[in-house]
From Swiss-Prot:
Residues 1-17 have a biased composition (Polar residues). Residues 710-726 have a biased composition (Basic residues). Residues 1-109, 214-461, 518-622, 644-726 are annotated as: Disordered. Residues 18-109, 644-701 have a biased composition (Low complexity). This is Putative uncharacterized protein DDB_G0286901. It comes from Dictyostelium discoideum (Social amoeba). Transmembrane segments: none annotated.
Amino acid sequence: MSPQQIQTAGINLSPQHNNTNNNNSNNNNNNNTNNNSNNTNNNNTNNNNNNNNNSNNNNINNNNNNNNTNTNANTNINNNNNNNNNNNNNNNNNNNINNNNNNINNNNINNNGNNVNLVNIGVPQLQQHLQGILSKQQLVNQQNSSIQQQIQQLANSIMITKQQIGQGQPNAQQQQQQLQQQQQLQNFQQLQQNLHNQGASLQSQAQQIQQMLNNNGNNLNNSNNNNNNNNSNSSSNNNNNNSSSNNSSSNNNSNNNNINNNNNNGNNNNNMGNNNNNMGNNNMGNNNMGNNNMNNNNMNNNNINNNNSNNNNNNNMNNNNNSNNNSNNMNNNNNNSNSNNNNNNNNNNNNNNNNMNNNNMNNNNNNNNNNMNNNNNNNNNNNNNNNNNNNMNNNNNMNMNNNMNNNNMNNNNNNNMNNNNMNNNNMNNNNMNNNNVNNNNMINNGQQPNQQQIQTGQSTNQQLHQQLQLLQQQQRASQQGFTPQQLQQLVNQPLTPFSNQIQNPFQQLPIQQPIQQLGNSGQFSNNNQNNMSNNGNNNNNNNSNNNINNNNNNNNNSNNNSNNNSNNNSNNNSNNNGNNNGNNNGNNNGNNNGNGNNNGNNNNNNNNNNNNNNNNYNPLNNNNIIGQNGMIINNSQILGSQNGVNNNNVQQFGNPQFFPYTQQPNQLPPNQQQNQSPQPSNMVSVSTTNINTNTSSPLSTDPSDEPSSKRVKKSSSKPSKSKGKK
């Protein structure tokens, strides 16, 4: 793969606002027909993503092992068996580590089923991820320096060879030596190109996270609410892509992986093609592995930046195929492989990534994505795929970041890589939001919360707090030597600069800096893929957490049958008509077809809003919503505050109030809130159109305390006659 192809495929920061518009137009075409089948197929997609996340968690812990493995993998086809063995060992190691990391990220949370923990951590998660980004920038710079040293050594070797040849003709051995040196030089150039892309990607990610931190993780979310709601319809378009068949669901994964892993595949392909002559060059293998590890960051960035472009491709193709569905599924595979990858080999490797992930997932989930996607390629390219999976492992911190991105960005960011653990969390968050939806429906219907519900919510909150403390302890234990003060210094220090030119004694590679300035909107509207994943994960997790989530879903269904049209219309009319179509079709179809589909679509649409409103500080939301404030909006916002109780608990960066359970003068710890008597008030249902999310006024239960533009009328919606489990 040429450097130009690497640039195009590795970091394709395509215009994102255009992608959002395309997604909206696709939404209108696809929502009515495909919402019903989307959820089931999304489960398969999310299963793949979850596998990716397991591997994502590995890389941070197994960088050295991965380097060794990549060295073996670079011995090319001749060492397939060895690579398989090594990769299997690494997979075993990764699995052991994944069990630990996933237990930290997922299992502890999933056991509760409510799974608000990672969402609740909020800003600390962003800080931890920014720490990881800064560490990875240092690693990229170190690797770039190492590559530069090796290029200099190679230059010396080439000069010595030329001096030995002199004016005469080289003999066969000298010709072979020159050929090997030229191949090594090309490999080094490719590695430097990839390192530069990775450095630019990391810098872009760090800028995004820093901007989120500067905005307390809230303003970006609020600015993206409309985009995210619009994207919820486009997520159903992506769901349509997945729903077109099991194959197309793995297509979407392969699309994301195609972009995400172009650099990885480029490295592997070039090394696979060239390292036959460099089998002894462990440094190259290690550097290549480092590149691949950093390419995972490109993958994350690409998932953020390029999902819209891929989604547009998928939507355009799947809009044509939606009417034909399964007949065109294989065509989707071919089209996706051609459009998303400038290189069929990369596409094979990416599909193999999916297949490898699917194989790992098959141990847990069955699942469909192995069906028609390149089983033969999987057999041929397991080495690359294992390495790619290991490369994706770098994303422990990215998982946290994506958790934050997902939560801050309507659960959208779970970009394939992180999507993946986050998808579980999103599912769980959605389940938690199901509880919020149940509470909202109950309150909007005019029912007063009883003491048992309040105590139950407070008890749940206390349990979540205890689990959060355990999770934070585990995460702190997994960190390597960063104190909160050092972390703040890392966050405040300028980002590591990365030169626009790669120093090379033989060839100057033109590098275009792909970093773009971030806007307040559109940057995260690329998360259509993630909304799709959230739908799928809702179904998955509903299946896995049926006891908890199905109860909530039943409540949602019973309430949604009477309330969804009014609630969704009131929320979505303020955003756009596309959402009305998506929500109404999704909810109506879901109600007609059963709880699974309805909850998938309903939770996706409603929970996008709920997550934005509640994510940064969810542990107190249920108690505050039911027990203290009582002024409920459909999206679980509380009048007089931003995002529920966020304003009271989230301030500028560096304030200890970022950490949810630091006791403040006016804030009781969760174990004492249980003793507070609730302050019931009249419950109202209002549109979010006139809510000023930038206000910092204290919580108020008196509508007269609000400006006239924010006063609300009581909802005329009648209480639902259906009764759900509390």
